[in-house]
Amino acid sequence: MVLTHLHADHCGGGVVKAGAGSGYRLTFPNAIYHASRAQWDWAVKNNPREEDAFLEENILPIMESGHLSLVDEECELFDGFSVRLCYGHTPGLMIPVIKYKDKTLVYTGDLIPTAAHIPLIWNMSYDIESLRTIDEKKSLLEEALSNNYILVFQHDESAECCTLEMTDKGIRAKEKFGFADINPPTGAVEKV
């Protein structure tokens, strides 16, 4: 289980109520939960800007379970699955980069939550360091454009994924599509 960061909407499903007022338990009791150390330290220290985003019941049971693995630096967690660290949205946000068949998918998390957030200055008001977010987005978008990566969005209802193109206004979404359309199953009917 890879937790991009510890805001409630990104880690809240990692635990469930244990029942009869007995606290919480892991949703996936056999899984290792990966989070960045920078994000973990930031979340448990808490701060007035994000105090409503970090809920103890979402994160403390993970630590108490002994199933928490803290990531200190950008690395490959599994074969073909690496994480990058960003600090603009919240310190230690992990961006998964996944090699899948002949493609590279980048799960943008809250660095680029929707296709509408691709323009550099279109960011979330929730970002802790907005200018750093812009720099991190610029770097990721340029790399993704140069290497034909597929971006996968956390919060976009109409575009789960997209490819990129350079326009006269900068890097923008080229093709938008659903996650299932990345590599449809053999024998799938092609959409017209």
Language model features by range: what are they?
Residues 12-23, 163-164:
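Metal-dependent catalytic neighborhoods of phosphoester/phosphodiester hydrolases
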Residues 101-192:
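Cap/insert and terminal regions of metallo-dependent hydrolase folds
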Residues 1-9, 19-85, 132-149:
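Metallo-beta-lactamase
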Residues 22-26, 95-102:
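Short amphipathic alpha-helices and their capping/turn segments at secondary-structure boundaries
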Residues 5, 33, 86, 96, ...:
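Divalent metal-coordination and catalytic microenvironments
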